[in-house]
Amino acid sequence: MPSATPILPRQQTAIVAEAAGKLRIQHNVTVPSPGPMVAIVKTAAVAINPVDAKMLDYSPVPGAVHGYDFAGTIVSMGPNTPAHLRIGDRVAGWVHGMNAVEPNVGAFAEYVASPADLILRIPDEMSFNDAASIGLGLFTAGLGLFHELKVPGSLSDPDGLEIAEDERFVLVAGGSTATGTRAIQLLRLAGLRPIATCSKANMDLVHRFGAEHAFDYSDPECAAEIRRYTGGTLAYALDCVAMADTTQLCYNAMGRAGGRYVTLEPFRSAIAETRPLTIEPSWLLALTVFGRKVDIDGEYSRDARPDDHKFAVELTVSVQALLDQGKFDTHPIKVMNGGWDGVKEGVDTIRTQAMSGQKLVYPV
């Protein structure tokens, strides 16, 4: 394993935003420097997320490097980085792509400047392609479940959960999404009882990641079936689809006593107002885990949330232990060709085609 810091080039190839809905490949983008608690990663693979297209379409930052999920090799580290990380480590992570505050920090680049305390070392047997699928889905699921939804249970002490079996149910709507499979797996590892909605075609997938039971979201009786299965005790729902239909389904599936509902987009207030006294709704933006101000237009803007970053660091430690023990699996991927040209096309693909049960990954 290399012990000396290699000399980084001054410029690199990266995909940057040009205008709303438009990206370009640029060959003279400045390589970021390793500041405090920052690791520079030589990118080996990147993954495409729906947010890549959404942010480009509705909140572009011209000239900023785009992309969130990556995997690669650490080639440089700044001061105060975690002692367990070394130059030469194979790692996975994610960053705030197309960031107005840090325009040279994005995953769609030859070199990525990543917060070192949110990086995961990957096992030797895990490919960079598989590892590239981890970042955004993992931290969205973790933040949603343990920080926002406040489910009982702990990844570090799953056997210490002292609640009745019928109080352990957690519904994951959209269980076959990349965030959904991460959520199901985390819940199972924390000693809880994940149940999921998905299509019939993806039921085997959600069962493989640990769902106790899967429900066909297209069945008109879906919510009633969930109530019957849980005995009317469901008190936690994570909505990974974030549409009006799934909000309504989650509300209808929850028990009479209510509970908490968390989604990944602003929820429909008209639905929330149907059970204002029993269900506490909220929605999250995973970008807050970096502990910095999120400079995005409208209701997606956030002040810095140090508590979210503290939680994310703790989650990283817990998931690192699971990876080291071989207990954490990755979401199914579809490996694509084309390098940076392919990545650019992939963002267009995710805009028009739903990726059911898999994630597009590009070796670069």
UniProtKB/Swiss-Prot annotation:
Record keyword Nucleotide-binding present: yes
Residues that, per the record, bind NADP(+): 51-54, 176-179, 199-202, 217, 264-265, 355-356
Residues binding substrate: L136, G137, L138, F139, T140, A141, G142, L143, A286, L287, T288, V289, F290
SUPFAM superfamilies assigned to the protein according to its UniProt record, in alphabetical order: GroES-like (SSF50129), NAD(P)-binding Rossmann-fold domains (SSF51735)
Pfam family, one: ADH_zinc_N
Keyword Phosphoprotein set for record: no
Keywords of the record: NADP, Nucleotide-binding, Oxidoreductase
Entry GO MF terms: nucleotide binding; oxidoreductase activity, acting on NAD(P)H
Alphabetized Gene3D superfamilies for the sequence: Medium-chain alcohol dehydrogenases, catalytic domain (3.90.180.10), NAD(P)-binding Rossmann-like Domain (3.40.50.720)
Any coiled-coil regions, as ranges: none
Associated pathway: Secondary metabolite biosynthesis
Enzyme Commission numbers on file: 1.-.-.-
Function: Trans-enoyl reductase; part of the tra gene cluster that produces terrestric acid. The clavatol biosynthesis cluster cla and the terrestric acid cluster tra are both involved in the production of peniphenones and penilactones. The non-reducing PKS claF is responsible for the formation of clavatol from successive condensations of 3 malonyl-CoA units, presumably with a simple acetyl-CoA starter unit, and 2 methylation steps. The esterase claE probably collaborates with claF by catalyzing the hydrolysis of ACP-bound acyl intermediates to free the ACP from stalled intermediates.
Family the entry assigns: Belongs to the zinc-containing alcohol dehydrogenase family.
Subunit field text: Monomer.
Protein's name in the database: Trans-enoyl reductase traG
Native source organism of the sequence: Penicillium crustosum (Blue mold fungus)
Gene: traG
